[in-house]
Amino acid sequence: MLFDTHVHLDDARYNDDRDAVIARARESGVEAFVTIGCDLATSGAAVEIAERYPFVYASIGVHPHEVKHIQDDWYNEFRCLAKNKNVVAYGEIGLDYHYNHSAPKEQRERFREQIQLAREIKLPMIIHTREAQEDTVSILREEKASDVGGVFHCFSGDAWLAKQALDLGFYLSFSGILTFHNSTPLREIAKATPLDRTLIETDCPYLTPVPYRGKRNEPSYVSRVAQQLASIHGPTLSFEQIGVQTTENAKRLFRIS
């Protein structure tokens, strides 16, 4: 029993074998996944994919890279998409100062707007933050993001950010980065994170875990993240226990019965 909380199944790299990718995930024990929107078009695509498969859910929103493209009618379009029963989250949203594909000031403004929208439509948020920890936390606090909660996806921050996220009532989601050779500090944070606040993801097709580095990532590989978590916790927690608990956590966050 596994729940991949962050996939990009609309990505063109799956166009030739999307059904086979999803079938492999199911065969490997992945019970469900959330496919993520990064702008209006990909949010619509996420909803379409979720309608096609009963075990796939969708998240809608605008990634910080893409906020410079937001048009006046987008938020109303998101309000309409949010009415679909398969939409379980708003995101991925946040701040990314590494690439600055959108100007930092505009990122912050749009982040606030999107938190406000998530609160209005009562959806938990999927947060992306890179080299913007303090601003991300400050804005989440100021905009009362805890009212709906959410998850820091693909967590790769430090212990300070982990504590701030947990204090806000958010979950931490760990990806294939956890398996990388140079991720010892992150593994320590994962070990210290309460299991009932832990999620797992692939962020596929990105961030392929060891031992599949160099290949396209896919949801079936989320088992490698669960295995790494079990290894981190040692004999006290089995792979099966990790799978059961993180799946329960995902269903609780996304209000999936």
Please report, for each region that a protein language model flagged, where it lies by residue.
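Mid-domain alpha/beta scaffold segments of enzyme catalytic cores
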Residues: 1-257
